[in-house]
């Protein structure tokens, strides 16, 4: 099976085939997801919350991202690896944006994801001109949570919805190969999807997008601190882990483990 590329994703949109995307933060999970033929593995700055225990993505550094990109890329043979550019890694200067994007590509990412439009448009253009594929991100942009004042639904009002569609078109013109839409009304996402040639991948953006993305710890039932409406839990792995560890503790205390079959 050939590795997923930007061309693969464009062809999927043209054929009406849905794109699958899931976060991954380490080699083991990446290898499992890759074996399932997930199209895109996103090394998300959400690792700040689900891996590092922060209450937002803002404290995540380039060193954090580079470390996890290296791990995920080793486990991905089929899936495209996309890396989030963390807070303030591309907001100051064009030179800094290109340099940091290059670090993530050297670490093993195929592409980077950058949040926003107007405030960082020149940086997005510059990274693309440096021959680095960029995925856009509009709607709820978690790195701007302190500006928004929370994780509320975006583009509820007509003016904001219209601006969202305009921004998506601007990002496409800049050269992004796909756009993530987060936590916007379904009808707004539908309008964006119909307006663009590049794929639109939704998270909390309804069924009309060209693909969907979820945080792996959310959809596997492993993260209890944050339970948004848009997450479907496909398993309760957290409970399975608790049960397994509890059994292990009990067997060790009772002297039942290790048994003969586990001894040399």
Swiss-Prot record:
Its EC number is 2.1.2.11. It catalyses: 3-methyl-2-oxobutanoate + (6R)-5,10-methylene-5,6,7,8-tetrahydrofolate + H2O = 2-dehydropantoate + (6S)-5,6,7,8-tetrahydrofolate. Pathway: Cofactor biosynthesis; (R)-pantothenate biosynthesis; (R)-pantoate from 3-methyl-2-oxobutanoate: step 1/2. Its main location: cytoplasm. HAMAP family: PanB. Homodecamer; pentamer of dimers. This is 3-methyl-2-oxobutanoate hydroxymethyltransferase.
């Amino acid at each position: 099976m050939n590795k997923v590329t930007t061309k693969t994703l464009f062809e999927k949109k043209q054929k009406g085939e849905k794109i699958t995307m899931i976060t991954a933060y380490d080699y083991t999970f990446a290898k499992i997801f890759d074996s399932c033929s997930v199209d895109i593995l996103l090394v998300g700055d959400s690792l700040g919350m689900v891996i590092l225990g922060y209450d937002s993505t803002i404290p995540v550094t380039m060193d954090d991202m580079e470390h996890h990109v290296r791990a995920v890329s080793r486990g991905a043979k089929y899936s495209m690896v996309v890396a989030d550019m963390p807070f303030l890694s591309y907001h100051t200067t064009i030179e800094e944006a290109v340099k940091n994007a290059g670090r993530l590509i050297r670490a093993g990412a195929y592409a980077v994801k950058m949040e926003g439009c107007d405030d960082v448009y020149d940086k997005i253009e510059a990274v693309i001109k440096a021959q680095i594929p960029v995925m856009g991100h509009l709607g709820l942009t978690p790195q701007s949570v302190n500006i928004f004042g929370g994780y509320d639904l975006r583009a509820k009002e007509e003016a904001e919805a219209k601006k969202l569609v305009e921004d998506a078109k601007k990002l496409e013109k800049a050269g992004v190969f796909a756009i993530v839409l987060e936590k916007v009304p379904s009808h707004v996402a539908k309008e964006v999807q119909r307006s663009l040639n590049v794929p639109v991948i939704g998270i909390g953006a309804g069924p009309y997008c060209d693909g969907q993305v979820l945080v792996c710890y959310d959809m596997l039932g492993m993260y209890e601190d944050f339970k948004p409406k848009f997450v479907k839990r496909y398993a309760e792995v957290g409970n399975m882990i608790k049960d397994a560890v509890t059994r292990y503790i009990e067997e060790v205390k009772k002297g039942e483990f290790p048994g003969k079959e586990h001894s040399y």
